Amino acid sequence: FDPITNGHLDVLARACRLFDRVIVAVASDNSSKKVTFSVDDRVRLIQENVSDLPQVSVESFSGLLVDYARKTEASVIVRGLRAVSDFEYEFQMGQMNRHLDSELETIFLMPNEKYFFTSSNLIKQVHLHGGRETHDLVPQNVLEALRQVVEQRDNQES
């Protein structure tokens, strides 16, 4: 969710058709990734796009997702799959989560095919290298936030 994309929102809408309560869990201490937006900004950007989904809450967490799922009494983790390349990583994560908590299920949902190639990293790279044609791939508030990131970077470089 760094940043949230329309692909994420599509998977979230699909999850809402399956579950009465959906928690968007935003990791606050993912030290293996360099993030563009703070956890508070990521939570805010998501919240601004799910206000019409009453069963959705957006929360940050630290530590293992499986521990957070236990704490919130979630029994299912929903993950989006865009391509076969996603499956290997997601399969390993799902298996590890099952090893850590045999009661926790992982289900995979595919987004609409128009979002198969969309990723947060690709969107950021396009913006950081001067591209702007991502209005159909991310919500408007994310576009504005990305423009601010690019402006701040450009101001620091000049």
Descriptions of predicted regions:
Residues 1-158:
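Nucleotidyltransferase catalytic core that binds NTPs
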